Amino acid sequence: HIGGIQAFLQENGDADNPVIIGVDEVWYNAFSQIATEPKQQGSVSGYLRMVLQGKALQGNINSKSGSHDISVTQGNTVAELLLGHGYHWNERFMGRAVCTENVETVMLSDKIRCNLLNPGKEELNQLVNYWISDMKRNIRNFKIYDDVLYNAAFEGSLVNISTEEHEREIKNISSSGIQSSDYRKINIVEWETRIDHSITNRSSISFLLQYDDITLLFPGDCPIQLFQEKLPKYIDVVKLPHHGSWANISREFIKNTSVSYYLLSTDGEKYGHPSPSVIGSIMDEAPIPAKIIKNYDLSQLETIGETEGEALWKSKTKN
């Protein structure tokens, strides 16, 4: 996700003269907004700077070729791109972190209401404390100074943490080898009840969008279980969290929530997404017939749902 946003911000250019699309505001939590530890006087130097630069390289799209030149990250982190290109950043939160304790409801227009569901301060504190603890394992006397390099290092570290967490969960969620005709035969009882404990996923920005009588849920990668009790019993559109992983949506939610459309965003090539139990439950246990809209025509879901292109074409022909 970080790499995609970096690429978009680089290509879109200046916020006042965008190449691709105009963006009114960006919600993004950088280290400088969520870190609560007091900053030290002085500057970053020596071994500390070297370690921070190494962490920063892990998350930059321009360093994937194997380059160890820190200059490739300068000006190219999400935080620096937002500032450098003049984007309005977390303005609805008065420049502070996007979290439920700061602002819970945002009116995007007279008719569009955004209810923030996640993260809370607890999730953000866990995230930043994990990173600080990791840094202290590398640097005994780790200190925080007022330097943009901390944002870059934090951003790069989270990409690496997220990848490691995905690798650990593959065996639990894999759908490889399962054909579309088999999803209805899956034994739902085998659905794992473990909730995703990934600190990166649990700090995802999640929100419920309401326009007139239309309701849309965008949980990001956060497990829906964290805010399930706050949700209405009917939702028009739900974007499946974490590419349809079983650890990020509960069987209870699918069985008890009337959803018209589930959006599935995955190419199916990494980590075995989507989880067969999730697809099987939507097909057989949802209280009303729900349509699955895919952004890729996955071979394992060949006869299930529609691609976004097909859905858009049908919508246009109806009108």
Q: Predicted segment positions?
A:
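Flexible, acidic/histidine-containing loops and adjacent segments that form or flank the divalent-metal
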Residues: 11-214, 290-291, 295-296, 306-319
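C-terminal regulatory/interaction regions
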Residues: 212, 222-225, 229-235, 252-256, ...
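Short, well-ordered alpha-helical packing segments
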Residues: 6-13, 27, 279, 283
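Active-site-proximal loop/helix segments of hydrolase catalytic cores
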Residues: 1-19, 123, 127-130, 191-266, ...
